[in-house]
Amino acid sequence: MTDKIRTLQGRVVSDKMEKSIVVAIERFVKHPIYGKFIKRTTKMHVHDENNECGIGDVVEIRECRPLSKTKSWTLVRVVEKAVL
């Protein structure tokens, strides 16, 4: 059994909540019949303790214990700030 902590990178799409952000994770999936790669997006609710993220920021997140009904990820660092 491995205890590797899952980390992902994505873009912030919402920061309207207090101490929470919504991060969109993009991945490419191959179509089973046609073989074309399709872009799929997963939205995750992430805990942002210091409210340091804004919309458009690229962030790194890691999995943690469930913090609420929908939040099981926490912010590690801001990789790139959005250009306003």
Swiss-Prot record:
SUPFAM superfamilies with a match to the protein in the record: Nucleic acid-binding proteins
Protein keywords: Ribonucleoprotein, Ribosomal protein, RNA-binding, rRNA-binding
Gene3D superfamilies: Nucleic acid-binding proteins
Biological processes, Gene Ontology terms: translation
Highest taxon listed in the record's lineage: Bacteria
General function of this protein: One of the primary rRNA binding proteins, it binds specifically to the 5'-end of 16S ribosomal RNA.
Family membership: Belongs to the universal ribosomal protein uS17 family.
Subunit structure: Part of the 30S ribosomal subunit.
HAMAP family the UniProt entry points to: Ribosomal_uS17_B (MF_01345_B)
Entry protein name: Small ribosomal subunit protein uS17
